[in-house]
Amino acid sequence: MSRRKFLQFGGAAAMTVLLPASGLLSGCSADQVTETLDNMGVKSGLDATFRGTREFTDSWGRTRTIPTVDKLERVYFTSALAQIFVFTLAPQLLGGTGMQFTPQELKYLPAGTENLVYMGSLSGGGEIDREMLLKQDIQLVIDCSGTTLSASDVSTAQKLEDQTGIPTLCIDGSFDNIRTAYQLLGEILGAEERAGKISEYLERVYNDVTAATAGIPDSEKVRLYYAEGPLGLQTEPDRGLHALTFDVAGANNVAAVEETQGIGMTNVSLETVLAWDPEVIIAWDDVIRGGADEIIRTDAKWSHISAVKNGRVYTMPNAPYAWCDRPPGVNRFLGIQWIANMLYPD
């Protein structure tokens, strides 16, 4: 079967309490039920369930008391990555937004997103409006990491929890763990069925693309340069957090540079890019992200590069999120398919 056949681009623990059918507890209030269970010697946490709370253990092993699914109405998040998880699982629970969207981006997002209160994000050293969190009656905060969850991630989330009193769950949302993250969040948000479908889709995309590109020798992989920033002279190294999409899609990322920790975007010179002579360039667009796609296509200084000479400079789709990197979430699985088809159309 051809690679193209494989790579056809397709688009884009709630606790249950079972009680006997007898009339033992019928007509009782929550307090009466709790008292009855206590008298029966039942100390398993069912009382918390009747009061609308339950215990949940996050990816770091922290156990927090959170609302039961039927009582959970307003959720917030510490980053755009965590917001994507909630967007794709249970958008009706969004208690605000950590991003300010353009009209073009809003076209692809759930109805009502434009009315969400902006409360900030902890990404990139930003801040969340603690007072607004309380004013908006946020019941739960989700923190998702783009890399393997670290003690620093947990410390930041714990600080927010200490300041607001709102339970904060830390979820490992790294690339290798993203399917598990969806399953956990589906459990938290009462969206297990949808989380299962998304997890299956992500696994299928990954398996199909990697199977279709696995047989390509390193010497035959297409040389790719990722042009970031307003001049196209910032990039991400092979295996860097913001370059994983290219690696999975089977590209030969030419950027032999050190990764800039945190935000990435390592500076390079045009002379270095000329020496790398990539066959394909993927650039930010100049309208939404202020990128250099048109500069690269039209500026004579870039004209000697193979990608430019052969008309293989491509603008990365950016709505509603960048398809290849930021935030490093489920959006990258669109990018994986797009890039693999573009590099290896046969």
Report residues per predicted region.
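Short helix-initiation/N-cap motifs at beta->coil->alpha
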Residues: 61-62, 119-129, 259-270
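A short, structured surface patch at a secondary-structure boundary
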Residues: 81-136, 140-151, 254
